[in-house]
Amino acid sequence: MRKLTLLLGLLLTLGSLHAQEKGQFVLQAEANAGVLFHDLLKDNRKVHPEVALGAVFGYQFSDHLSLGVGANVRQTSDVVTWLPVFASAKYRFNDSKVRPFVEARCGYAFCLLGLGYKGSSKGNSYVSSALCEGFYAAVAGGCSFGRTDLGLGVQFINIHTHEMGWNIAGEPFQYESQDIKPAVFLHYAYNFYFGK
């Protein structure tokens, strides 16, 4: 299956080496893989692998600039799943076959599946949850090869941690924290152009 996927990706890349034209709509299908830096489980693991699949629908205003809106589903190895919805701006720097680009995104991430766990410490029992929800931003840079984009990026996601429990005397307690944490990712996208 991996070989078939790699072969299909290679054929799509090689079969579409032509420059984008202004005045077209673009649908960008993408896949990302990276790591999120946060201690989600209080288990001293600060690095959590994540994968993402998504799409951006936009308009190519010039040979260099496209603007759009998009969403992707992101999941960490700890099964925290979230859906960032964002506005996107992409700028390609020249008109050659290999075109450097930079892309910026800003939006809101909705939690689809949080991470919950139970525990006890020093006579206290507690239930905790970690949600990736709130502010979302990302910046990526790389090169476009025809319709294919390859790059490296960094994203910032709002991590909301909520903990509640009961102390040894049976009294309830609650703790909440909110942090914006970074992640780095490898970016692969294939662009479909239409409307002209």
Which role does the model predict for each range below?
Residues 1-25, 192-196:
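Bacterial Sec-dependent N-terminal signal peptides
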Residues 21, 45-49, 79-81, 129-135, ...:
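Short sequence motifs at beta-strands and strand-loop junctions characteristic
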Residues 24, 33-35, 56-122, 129-147, ...:
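Gram-negative (and chloroplast) outer-membrane scaffold detector with strong preference
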Residues 28-56:
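N-terminal targeting signals for Sec/Tat export/insertion, comprising classic cleavable signal peptides
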Residues 39-43, 73-75, 120-129, 170-178:
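Extracellular loop and loop/strand-boundary signature of outer-membrane beta-barrel proteins
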Residues 48, 85-86, 118-124, 165-173:
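Flexible, surface-exposed loop regions and adjacent strand-edge segments
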Residues 152, 156-163:
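C-terminal beta-signal and adjacent terminal beta-strands/loops
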Residues 161-187:
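Outer-membrane beta-barrel proteins, especially TonB-dependent receptors
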